[in-house]
Swiss-Prot record:
Localization in the cell: Apical cell membrane; Early endosome membrane; Cell membrane; Recycling endosome membrane
Residue positions, PTM Phosphoserine: S548, S659, S669, S685, S699, S711, S736, S767, S790, S795, S813, S1457
List of residues binding ATP 1: W401, G457, S458, T459, G460, A461, G462, K463, T464, Q492
A GO molecular-function descriptor: chloride transmembrane transporter activity
Record function comment: Epithelial ion channel that plays an important role in the regulation of epithelial ion and water transport and fluid homeostasis. Mediates the transport of chloride ions across the cell membrane. Possesses an intrinsic ATPase activity and utilizes ATP to gate its channel; the passive flow of anions through the channel is gated by cycles of ATP binding and hydrolysis by the ATP-binding domains. The ion channel is also permeable to HCO(3)(-); selectivity depends on the extracellular chloride concentration.
Species: Muntiacus reevesi (Reeves' muntjac)
Membrane topology summary: Multi-pass membrane protein
Annotated region (Disordered), positions in chain: 1452-1481
Gene expressing this chain: CFTR
Protein name from the UniProt record: Cystic fibrosis transmembrane conductance regulator
Chain positions of motif PDZ-binding: 1479-1481
Residue intervals passing through the bilayer: 78-98, 123-146, 196-216, 223-243, 299-319, 340-358, 859-879, 919-939, 991-1011, 1014-1034, 1096-1116, 1131-1151
UniProt remark on domains: Binds and hydrolyzes ATP via the two cytoplasmic ABC transporter nucleotide-binding domains. The two ATP-binding domains interact with each other, forming a head-to-tail dimer. Normal ATPase activity requires interaction between the two domains. The first ABC transporter nucleotide-binding domain has no ATPase activity by itself.
Length: 1481
């Protein structure tokens, strides 16, 4: 970033905004980068502004019972706000005075008034000076008000963020991320955009009073006829506005529905393709789009009428004011033209400025009240700690998470009741919901310094809640907790902040080289780090998107271990690690490196329990056991079934099963679910979409999965998994994740109205608490991952020294926070967020316009029709113009007398002028034909939007995964949210306005030129100057806008990142560090936005200066060249004043159109994506013998269409190579093996070795080479859809879309209810579905949030059974499963898929024992393919992963497992351990 020229600019340079010239020049010549942007002044920095407002807000809180945020804002900004308001008023007053001088000029041409002719030239000079003064007052005032609005937004952004970091977990459970993002993006934009209009709430009434006084002098009481019409029109416009809002509110729900499903499809596009559901998903979205467009059209027609009313009103105002007066008293020309000019100003004040100002105040006060409520929410209270305490003691503690879930279920119940699915047991599902039960009851234990306590228990038992209570996140309602307060924490779902690996581990604690190296070694990160070119200085994106799940988990653990604390809370830190790595880390890090520290480890592994000093087993929130391992064996022989839930499912009664399901539901929000996406959007949030996104959610959040850009969300939006991916630009690089500005308002004066913040979608209530308990990034393979994660060494030499050396004794005076200011610079900050570089030029190309016009054939005809109508209008004007001199000549003899003597009749010459004005007063006379021109245009443009959405949806659904893998989810979602909103809402009316204004200007110029040909000579250079100036400015402004929109992403992304890691942040006390990061992100955005506002003002001022020169030329040409024609001077000057406002407006509209057409460019970019080959790759080449050729083709077609294929499920793989993206490294190389029909094959390999990749390659979801045959049919000889239908799939990330159970199981509607129920019975889903009101018609929302992860897996299983697939692919089906569901899946696999070929990637040894063969993948290749007996007898990876004792049991277990009855599983300890072994391979 560079030093700003503003610092040294002179007063004149500041007044004329000349200091922006260097950046405008640079932007015109080359592409602008972040380094070209100027530093902000200290008065605009987030630190200073937030400190100022926070001080006033604290004062307000301290002094009053009922604090008001507006009082704090008033004390900070009021006087500057009023100063600019007064300047703005003076500028507006000059507009009211101009018509007086115009009247005097016209009067000076009166034949009876020759004495005044000499002063006409001075009056002309006075009129020109008024324009110059207005220009010099208005622009600095508007800029000053925009600047204050920006400062208010920055101060409130910062205040909201600081408050967010202090909120209690209970409050966070009730706030959705969509609400938070909406609070920041939607509400606060109102200050930036609206503050310049706010003063018109008092300026407009004063102006109207002044104008009415001046008009009274001309027309007496008849003045009120025109005013009455304007007031009626203002009320009519308000009514139309209300009707439009009604349609938009109805439409918001439909948009939301469409975006929720679109985001679910985009996030799970792999599953959609695997199930061959593209057509079904397209149909669902197109049906929703149809309903949405009906409402869009209604809203657009109403807005069109509203907009047209303004254009047409001018004529009526003049007509109603002048005509009655003229009929009764007669009128002179001076009065007509003066009245016309006054009415133009009056119309703007009454129908535009005043209503807009009232709306601005209404919106702003609403936003301030929302923020005020938020700032008064309950804060997190830190517990009182005793720093001298060495033990951790808990005495009889009970705690509640506040019941926040009842509303969700009530809503689900209500939604389904509304669908009239009546059913007798509507209440069954909800009746036994124990809302408000304590999450922990009566917990007591004591750990001494240096001890390790293992906490175990089934899902939902309260393990994480226990850690939260120790950290102070969950307040105990009874009992006492004692510890020193110096805590370190490792979350269950690894949280990575944007920054380097080193930053993530040190996390603001002072750096100690020896400690850092020891921790890296103990957490097995050395080898991973050595593979990166930048080593530990590699910059990670949000959520650590470039890392595997195991790497993220180890970095999170390293961060916790690096901090020197008294108590370490480790919440299931080994979840994503293979067994070898886990063993090494547990021994070297937890047992040796941290030997002298107090540790609480949440785990379910038997080996960990054996080594723990104390064991605490929780069951349903209570202590099931507390003591040592030997006591556990003696006192609780059945402990393993409680711990692992190892009873077989069949033993449970229906009631017991119901309670398990209910418990899962009751606690679902605390149970992280790797597939939870967080693109959230508040329901009203999509009134107009723009960036999140949501970002996001990317629901925001982006849920997007709002991947950044939100991302949530988006960027953002989208952008992190939530918001993060929403980047859509370096060309719009980032998320926008949040779509929120009212459509249709001008884009120029506001921050990108179709904003680029995180896009967050989803009408779902996803609380922030849920977000924190979700895994930070999709479990799916990250395509950015370095493919060469060659496996870590199988064994690390034990570090004998680790236990003896205490790395914490080398403490530097104390672990202090780093000095942040030098540490983070803006360039690094931006590097933390992935950008999708879009090659979209800075200015929209003509090719884009051409393609847009030709998308729908009727658009061309409509545009031609508009031109024809316009030519008819101009022709009519010219005809009148030809007749005009004759009429004037005929009446000239009588005109003087009648002017003096007769008052009852309008003077004939005046009449001809007036008639002429009616036909030609081009600024307002599009009356009769305007409607015929505008409505077809708006209607057709919405049809074009419909066509583009349809093409883009098809394109995305049919694009190959290798292309989709290079795009961010949030980026794709932004096209469907933000850009489609632009095409639906903003573009049609902006184009209509532009066409209307352009034609008005052309018409006015033609008329003026015909009346006074000399003026044409002045007009040509002026229009040329406008066009050149626009082209010059557009290059820079669009780039600045793009940089500004990118600058938004880090703000929303940082918010979501902070929320995801809030518990970690608070445990480490890093709030100030993150506030500083947030301020850096804000300052980065401010630098871009301030520069954009300044260059925009430079441009507007230059336009006005060109016009002032034009007006001076017109005035003096007309004064000096016109002889006796007072009417001619009147028309020329009146039209010239009218042209001024209209031409500026037209130029601004053209810039808006260009800006909005960038959305069209992005949509075209997606439409042009390559598609998957739906047809066989190698079609048979015709041979010379055409008959033989036909036979071959027919035979091949028969193979493809044979209903029985595949019949056996035999699979042969030859030389299979797979890549995630074109041109990327091969993840698998030369894989060859074959599987017999009905065989079960287990895939073995370390984390990141390519097991999931192999399953994707089977489905042709990657870039593959080689060949696979199923039952003798090669994948090259049949279509992709046919090939994929041969497989049943249970993916790692389960896909449940928003829709009924029936739709989720059978989206094409191929099966009857009877068949669906039969399959539901087979897989154990019937008891689940029957508990919901409506049963199969119950609508699942938010990714099936009312189902546990296990039930979602059963849904996938049911889909596979229904598809009657012969080959089943399972990718980690037991990950995050409760043991009961896991048993059902095992049982179903044995029964329903007994004759099928099963390929299984799994971490549980127990599941692998049922496989006949194993395929070991290592370093991208097949290392071994053998039976279990062979593998156990040789030195293999499988053998290494199993302890010697277990190995002895495996062979007999293998042989007898099928016959052995499991009804008494817990009887023998050995059998139990073996059955529940959750060790991961």
């Amino acid at each position: 970033m560079q030093r700003s020229p503003l610092e040294k600019a002179s007063v004149v340079s500041k007044l004329f905004f000349s200091w922006t010239r260097p950046i405008l020049k640079k932007g015109y010549r080359q592409r602008l980068e972040l380094s070209d942007i100027y530093h902000i002044s200290s008065s605009d920095s987030a630190d200073n502004l937030s400190e100022k407002l926070e001080r006033e807000w604290d004062r307000e809180l301290a002094s009053k019972k009922n604090p008001k945020l507006i009082n704090a804002l008033r004390r900070c900004f009021f006087w500057r706000f009023m100063f600019y308001g007064i300047i703005l008023y003076l500028g507006e007053v000059t507009k009211a005075v101009q018509p007086l001088l115009l009247g005097r000029i016209i009067a000076s041409y009166d034949p009876d008034n020759k004495a005044e002719r000499s002063i006409a030239i001075y009056l002309g000079i006075g009129l020109c000076l008024l324009f110059i003064v207005r220009t010099l007052l208005l622009h600095p005032a508007i800029f000053g008000l925009h600047h204050i609005g920006m400062q208010m937004r920055i101060a409130m952004f910062s205040l909201i963020y600081k408050k967010t970091l202090k909120l209690s977990s209970r409050v966070l459970d009730k706030i959705s991320i969509g609400q938070l993002v909406s609070l920041l993006s939607n509400n606060l934009n109102k200050f930036d955009e609206g503050l310049a209009l706010a003063h018109f709430v008092w300026i407009a009434p004063l102006q109207v009073t002044l104008l009415m006084g001046l008009l009274w002098e001309l027309l007496q009481a008849f003045t009120f006829c025109g005013l009455a019409f304007l007031v009626v029109l203002a009320f009519l416009q308000a009514g139309l506005g209300k009707m439009m809002m009604k349609y938009r509110d109805q439409r918001a729900g439909k948009i939301n529905e469409r975006l929720v499903i679109t985001s679910e499809i985009i996030e799970n596009i792999q599953s959609v393709k695997a199930y061959c559901w593209e057509e079904a998903m397209e149909k669902i979205i197109e049906n929703l789009r149809q309903t949405e467009l009906k409402l869009t059209r209604k809203a657009a027609y109403v807005r069109y009428l509203n907009s047209s009313a303004f254009f047409f009103s001018g004529f009526f105002v003049v007509f109603l004011s002048v005509l009655p007066y003229a009929l009764l008293k007669g009128i002179i020309l001076r009065k007509i033209f003066t009245t016309i000019s006054f009415c133009i100003v009056l119309r703007m004040a009454v129908t535009r400025q005043f209503p807009w100002a009232v709306q601005t105040w209404y919106d702003s006060l609403g936003a301030i009240n929302k923020i005020q409520d938020f700032l008064q929410k309950q804060e997190y209270k830190t517990l009182e700690y005793n720093l001298t305490t060495t033990d951790v003691v808990m005495e009889n503690v009970t705690a509640y998470w506040e019941e926040g879930f009842s509303k969700l279920f009530e809503k689900a119940k209500e939604n389904n009741n509304n669908r009239k699915i009546s059913n007798g047991d509507n209440n069954l599902f909800f009746s036994n919901l124990l809302l408000g039960a304590p999450v922990l009851k009566d917990i007591s234990f004591k750990i001494e310094r240096g001890q390790l306590m293992a906490v175990a228990g089934s899902t939902g038992a309260g393990k994480t809640s226990l850690l939260m209570m120790i950290m102070g996140e969950l307040e105990p309602s009874e009992g006492k907790i004692k510890h020193s307060g110096r805590i370190s924490f490792c979350s269950q779902y690894s949280w990575i902040m944007p920054g380097t690996i080193k930053d993530n581990i040190i996390f603001g604690v002072s750096y100690d080289e020896y400690r850092y190296r020891s921790v890296i070694k103990a957490c097995q990160l050395e080898e991973d780090i050595s593979k990166f070119a930048e080593k530990d200085n590699i910059v990670l994106g949000e959520g650590g998107i470039t890392l595997s799940g195991g790497q993220r988990a180890r970095i999170s653990l390293a961060r916790a271990v690096y901090k020197d604390a008294d108590l370490y809370l480790l919440d299931s830190p080994f979840g994503y690690l293979d067994v070898l790595t886990e063993k090494e880390i547990f021994e070297s890090c937890v047992c040796k490196l941290m030997a002298n520290k107090t540790r609480i480890l949440v785990t379910s592994k038997m080996e960990h329990l054996k080594k723990a000093d104390k064991i605490l087993i929780l069951h349903e929130g209570s202590i099931y056991f507390y003591g040592t391992f030997s006591e556990l064996q003696n006192q609780r022989p059945d402990f393993s079934s409680k711990l692992m839930g190892c009873d077989t499912f069949d033993q449970f009664t229906a009631e017991r099963r119901n309670s398990i399901i209910t418990e899962t539901l009751r606690r679902f929000s605390l149970e992280g679910d790797t597939s939870v996406s967080w693109n959230e959007t508040k329901k009203p949030s999509f009134k107009q979409t723009g960036e999140f996104g949501e970002k996001r959610k990317n629901s925001i959040l982006n849920s997007i999965n709002s991947k950044r850009k939100f991302s949530v969300a988006q960027k953002t939006s989208l952008q992190m998994n939530g918001i993060e991916e929403t980047s859509d630009e370096p060309l719009e690089r980032k998320l926008s994740l949040v779509p929120h500005s009212e459509p249709g308002e001008g884009i120029l004066p506001r921050s990108n109205a179709v904003n680029s913040g995180p896009t967050f979608l989803g009408g779902r209530r996803q609380s922030v608490l849920n977000l924190m308990t979700c895994s930070s990034v999709n479990q799916g393979q990250s395509i950015h991952r370095k493919t060469a994660t060659s496996t870590r060494k199988m064994s690390l030499a034990p570090q004998a020294s680790l236990a003896e050396i205490d790395i914490y004794s080398r403490r530097l005076s104390q672990d202090t926070g780093l000095e942040i200011s030098e540490e983070i610079n803006e360039e690094d900050l931006r590097d933390c967020f992935f950008d999708d570089v879009e090659n979209i030029p800075a200015v929209t190309t003509w090719n884009t316009y051409l393609r847009y016009i030709t998308v729908h054939k009727s658009l061309m005809f409509v545009l031609i029709w508009c031109l024809v109508v316009f030519l008819a209008e101009v022709a009519a004007s010219l005809v009148v113009l030809c007749l005009f001199p004759k009429i004037l000549f005929q009446d000239k003899g009588n005109s003087t007398k009648s002017a003096n003597n007769s008052y009852a009749v309008i003077i004939t010459s005046t009449s001809s002028y007036y008639i002429f004005y009616i036909y030609v007063g081009v600024a307002d006379t599009l009356l009769a034909l305007g409607l015929f021109r505008g409505l077809p245009l708006v209607h057709t443009l919405i049809t074009v939007s419909k066509t583009l959405h349809h093409k883009m949806l098809q394109s995305v659904l049919q694009a190959p995964m290798s292309t989709l893998n290079t795009l961010k989810t949030g980026g794709i979602l932004n096209r469907f949210s933000k850009d489609i909103a632009v095409l639906d809402d903003l573009l049609p009316l902006t184009i209509f306005d532009f066409v209307q204004l352009l034609l008005i200007v052309i018409g006015a110029v033609v008329v003026v030129s015909v009346l006074q040909p000399y003026i044409f000579l002045a007009t040509v250079p002026v229009i040329a100057a406008f066009i050149l100036l626009r082209a010059y400015f557009l290059h820079t402004s669009q780039q600045l806008k793009q940089l500004e929109s990118e600058g938004r992403s880090p703000i929303f992304t940082h918010l979501v990142t902070s929320l995801k890691g809030l518990w970690t942040l608070r445990a480490f006390g890093r709030q100030p560090y993150f506030e500083t990061l947030f301020h850096k992100a804000l300052n980065l955005h401010t630098a871009n936005w301030f520069l954009y506002l300044s260059t925009l003002r430079w441009f507007q001022m230059r336009i006005e200066m060109i016009f002032v020169i034009f007006f001076i030329a017109v005035t003096f040409i007309s004064i000096l060249t016109t002889g006796e024609g007072e009417g001619r001077v009147g028309i020329i000057l009146t039209l010239a004043m009218n042209i001024m406002g209209t031409l500026q407006w037209a130029v601004n509209s053209s810039i808006d159109v260009d800006s909005l057409m960038r959305s069209v460019s992005r949509v075209f970019k997606f439409i042009d994506m390559p598609t998957e080959d739906g047809k066989p790759n190698n079609s048979f080449r015709p041979s010379k013998d055409s008959q033989l050729s036909k036979v071959m083709v027919i035979e091949n077609q028969h193979v493809k269409k044979d209903d029985i294929w595949p019949s056996g499920g035999q699979m042969t793989v030859k030389d299979l190579t797979a890549k995630y993206i074109d041109g990327g490294n091969a993840i698998l190389e030369n894989i060859s093996f074959s599987i017999s029909p009905g065989q079960r094959v287990g895939l073995l390999g370390r984390t990141g070795s390519g097991k999931s990749t192999l399953l994707l390659a089977f489905l042709r979801l990657l870039n593959t080479k080689g060949e696979i045959q199923i039952d003798g049919v090669s994948w090259d000889s049949i279509t992709l859809q046919q090939w994929r239908k041969a497989f049943g799939v249970i993916p790692q990330k389960v896909f449940i879309f928003s829709g009924t159970f029936r739709k989720n199981l059978d989206p094409y509607g191929q099966w009857s209810d009877q068949e669906i129920w039969k399959v539901a019975d087979e897989v154990g889903l019937r008891s689940v579905i029957e508990q919901f009101p409506g049963k199969l018609d119950f609508v699942l929302v938010d990714g099936g949030c009312v189902l546990s992860h296990g039930h979602k897996q059963l849904m996938c299983l049911a889909r596979s059974v229904l598809s009657k697939a012969k080959i089943l692919l399972l990718d980690e089906p037991s990950a995050h499963l409760d043991p009961i569901t896991y048993q059902i899946i095992r049982r179903t696999l044995k029964q329903a898929f007994a004759d099928c070929t099963v390929i299984l990637s799994e971490h549980r040894i127990e599941a692998m024992l049922e496989c006949q063969r194993f395929l070991v993948i290592e370093e991208n290749k097949v290392r071994q393919y053998d039976s279990i007996q062979r593998m156990l007898s040789e030195k293999s990876l499988f053998r290494q992963a199993i302890s010697p004792a277990d190995r002895l049991k495996l062979l007999p277990q293998r042989n007898s497992s099928r016959q052995k009855s499991r009804s008494n599983i817990a009887a023998l300890k050995e059998e139990t351990e073996e059955e529940v072994q959750e060790t991961k391979i």
